[in-house]
Amino acid sequence: MAAGSITTLPALPEDGGSGAFPPGHFKDPKRLYCKNGGFFLRIHPDGRVDGVREKSDPHIKLQLQAEERGVVSIKGVCANRYLAMKEDGRLLASKCVTDECFFFERLESNNYNTYRSRKYSSWYVALKRTGQYKLGPKTGPGQKAILFLPMSAKS
């Protein structure tokens, strides 16, 4: 590109589609990779939540849905359940959406995301180095256990 030149980008794709989101937008399934131990967040059909290192595990495919600005719900695609944080800080998967299923999603300065409970606002979704979830009251800012990298889960 020559100095002083201006490049313009098309406002709409040539096929006339909306083009509102680039490829890989939030509607595509994701895998949440935890910085602590290299586990992917897994939601089981029986409601259990943990982490696994196996990239091909079908239960790590997650649907992140924006509920309002900065707030998401996280649904296990295969399990058909929603990630929830209970009043004692346990993570589990609920068959239906409740007020315990909403999380503040924040992009941190290190480019990892954190998911903080909207209902229990000082607690985060977190995985221990063993792959087990970490209780909400034991989580806090600055911990590796709360850092997740959203990755594409397209087949």
Swiss-Prot record:
On the tree of life, the source organism's domain of life is Eukaryota
The ranges of region (Disordered) come to 1-20
A cellular component term from Gene Ontology for this protein is: nucleus
Q: Name one GO molecular function term.
A: growth factor activity
The feature of type site (Important for interaction with integrin) is located at: K128, R129, K134
**Region annotation Heparin-binding: residue ranges?**
128-144
Question: Which Pfam families does the UniProt entry name for this protein?
Answer: FGF (PF00167)
Q: Does the keyword Secreted apply?
A: yes
- Keyword terms: Angiogenesis, Developmental protein, Differentiation, Growth factor, Heparin-binding, Isopeptide bond, Mitogen, Nucleus, Phosphoprotein, Secreted, Ubl conjugation
Q: Which residues carry this modification: Phosphotyrosine?
A: Y82
Does the keyword field hold Ubl conjugation? Answer: yes
Crosslink (Glycyl lysine isopeptide (Lys-Gly) (interchain with G-Cter in SUMO1)) position: K95
Q: Which SUPFAM superfamilies match?
A: Cytokine
UniProt motif Cell attachment site: location: 46-48, 88-90
PANTHER family found in the cross-reference section: FIBROBLAST GROWTH FACTOR (PTHR11486)
Q: State whether it acts alone or in a complex, and with which partners, per the record.
A: Monomer. Homodimer. Interacts with FGFR1, FGFR2, FGFR3 and FGFR4. Affinity between fibroblast growth factors (FGFs) and their receptors is increased by heparan sulfate glycosaminoglycans that function as coreceptors. Interacts with CSPG4, FGFBP1 and TEC. Found in a complex with FGFBP1, FGF1 and FGF2. Interacts with FGFBP3. Interacts with integrin ITGAV:ITGB3; the interaction is required for FGF2 signaling. Interacts with SNORC (via the extracellular domain). Interacts with glypican GPC3.
Family assignment from sequence similarity: Belongs to the heparin-binding growth factors family.
Q: What is this protein called?
A: Fibroblast growth factor 2
